Amino acid sequence: LAPPGERRADDWAHAASDLLARMDAQGFAAPEARPVRVTSYPSLEDKGRLTRNTRPEHVATPREAAVALIVGRRSPDLWSVAALRLVALGAAASSPWLEPAGAWWAGRWGGEPLERAIARAYFARLLPTAREAASRGDGWRSPLLLVPARAALARSIMECAPARHGAARAALLALLGTAPPGDLDSLCRGAGVEAPKVERRYAALVDSLARAGQSATGAPAPRPWRPADGFVRGVCLAHSVSLERGYLSASCAGELQRLRTLGANWVSLSPFGFVPGAGAPDIAMSADGGPDEETDESVAEAAARARALGLRVLLAPHLWSRGWTGSLEFGTAGWPRFFACYREFLIHYALLAEREGMDGLVIGHELGSATARDPGRWRALAGEVRRVYGGTLTYSANWDHEAEAIGFWDSCDLIGVSFYDPLATAPGATQESMTAAARRALASLKALARRTGRPVLLTEAGYPATPTAALRPWEENRRGVADPEAQRACYDALLTALDSEDWVAGLFVWKWFTAPPAPASADRSYSPAGKPAESVLVRAYSGWRDRPVRVLPRSGP
């Protein structure tokens, strides 16, 4: 496939040649003339469609690396090129240590200098120790922590090899076997080095790299929301579940442009984790899933496209389950495991949000049974997130009084609420009565804003295009006829009620797909795209471009 521009391709080729020359000079020359092929794709979507792998780069065959750039990045990391050289020297292409070792040689990973990734985790006290990095672990672990740590550990093992010709190479290649052992002592025995010496070298190395990483360049840092920024005119951008229609797609780029045109100034992005249900507290991640999922690279791509249009980004990780996540139950023995998994889930997305410069992060979404158990645990989790993430924090409470019961709003910057309060108690409600119902629901949130001294952000607010939209806004009835007029009336009621409430920080409309359903007239989903509700939203957002936000004086303890 033709590279994206001759000059860029030449630059990449020179960078790859320089990398291989450095490996040659340090005793990692290929045993024979062995050309390395780097296939460059115009976009991650193209790469994913043709290879079914949407990672920015991967080892496609023992002699070929496949690369593509996330929007806004100027060059690939080229860890895959270093990995190909290691494979040529005998490393297993399937080794879990191949990518970290390649990242060490390349000096880059995740679109930034390796020392910057290490610094982010190190100063947040999240970087794994040498023993933790060597361990296979119990369950999923964030690659945003594990890959940089293992890169440094691979280098430490090399540096602790005996001072004889070829020893460092032999030590590294021993680490890169098909099935390396899952603990530091066994790894070190296999590599012929002393584990205590490796631990000491690792500790010194990551400290040095982290201090260097403080001044390394990367994406702009998150910019927290402030009341002076004005009203958040947000839209929840939902991933249409396929590569060609989701966050990585050209369709998503078009919808982001459309949202900017209709007056939005923020979008939220929602990667998911799956919880099987009662008695199964583990979380299956989409972060490093298949090409049709909300992977890290797809979220990063959508965020970069949004920022390029002047849109700010709220990262809102969700859990989903076979039942409602607000009533998850794991029993006395299962809850500690759930919280351990959820911590890994949330810290991962905090790291991603910081790396990619996303301005806001939702630390939980409609998890009522979990938030009711231990406010102190949530407060501690928010504290851990703040060590690594510098943007705005909120939690998205369900509309049915969860917000009033939350005991850790003092750890958040905004009161987040999924606003699905009913606007009617029976069919046939008038526009005036629905507006009055919206005002009553907002009044209870205003009392919470006074008690906490924090503005309220409607992290979700929306209505399906169904006849029962005003009665049960939380229910997306996938059967029956579409009723776009009922959806329009609900939006009109909410937006009219919000018009005079300057203590509300903003709202995110639920939801707008990266590839809207067609035809819109028959679509029963929450999306207002192409329906009468869209014009109501455009009118409101156009009128709120300079809308101020007032922080109410705190009246509670």
Regions found by a protein language model. Give the residues of each.
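Juxtacatalytic substrate-recognition/specificity segment
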Residues: L1-S95, R136, W140, G182-D185
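Acidic/His/Gly-enriched intrinsically disordered linker/tail segments
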Residues: P62, A93-Q214
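Aromatic-rich peripheral "rim/lid" segments of glycoside hydrolase catalytic domains that contact
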Residues: A212-D229, C236, G246-Y247, P473-R479, ...
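Substrate-binding cleft and catalytic face of glycoside hydrolase catalytic domains
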Residues: P227-R233, A238, L262-I283, E293-T371, ...
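Conserved, mostly hydrophobic/aromatic
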Residues: L259, V267, A306, L361, ...
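Aromatic- and acidic-residue-enriched segments that line the glycan-binding/catalytic groove
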Residues: S286-G290, R322-A340, C412, R472-E476, ...
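Glycoside hydrolase catalytic-domain groove-lining segments
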Residues: E293-E297, E301-R312, A316, G376, ...
